[in-house]
Amino acid sequence: MTKITEVAAAVIERPGEFLLAQRPAGKPYPGYWEFPGGKIEPGEDPRSALVRELREELGIEVRAATPWITRVYAYTHATVRLHFWRVTAWDGEPQPLEDQDIRWQSVAAPDVAPMLPANAPVLAALALPAVMIVSDATAMGIDRWIERLTALVVQEQVLVQVREKAMEHLRVQHLVSRALTRAEPFGSRVVVNSDSGSFPQATGIHLTSRALMEATARPAALLVGASCHDADQLAQAVRLGLDYAVLGAVKPTASHPGATPLGWERFADLARDLPMPVYAIGGLTRADLAEAREHGAHGVALLSAAFG
């Protein structure tokens, strides 16, 4: 059995930026850029290791950190399991205490190279917005929904999921085209729910849980996610190499009044140690974002509270 080295890795964030460190001479992959962190010692949990490593490596004291994603990568010299945490508050100013270079990078356009192979895919995950909005144009009306979307994307970058199961194909096509025109100039991306049809002009596709379980390979799209409700569906999303999952319902919802919600503890159990970002959905608002992240979510997906 291959020995796996457990590593705590920090995504240290300030508005629009994150911190990378360059590996010094004398270590494997010298000159490569990576997220700060280091090995988890026997008896340590990932958060404790993270706090210790950032104190030793950068001279900062972590005040706020939340679990994010976990990725396994096999290098020629070692196989590592990287436990990524998002660090959003700390005391002190990061300093290179181990002869390494450090640089703040734009989330939208990081410009250092080369990146450690294990860390490069993390940049795509980090670029996903914290909020997904799910369309409700059938009930609201296309013009009104587009008007609300237009006002939103000027202020906030979001991931837009067009999900209109009761709308005819040509009207969905019209909605997708207008959503793309409004959203893309401001950096927001648009995916279309697989129940609404195929629209190659969109950024990507969002699989229903049924379509997810029927899939034998990742769909050919730039961005692919899926709705999940249990561990089996999440495992299938991992097997297909999807870019994100949406997991819920976390709280009671008006659309599914008889369903038993997951609750935050069950959500955390299901989302733990997954390699892709997970959005929490179900009865949530933007006010739930902090709690969602405490339980391992990348962000929240909103329907009724999308514009509230």
Q: Where in the sequence are the language-model features?
A:
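Conserved N-terminal beta-strand and adjoining loop/helix that marks the start
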Residues: 1-19, 70
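Conserved, mostly hydrophobic/aromatic
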Residues: 133, 160, 237, 245, ...
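Glycine-rich phosphate-binding active-site loops on the catalytic face of alpha/beta enzymes
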Residues: 209-217, 246-258, 283-308
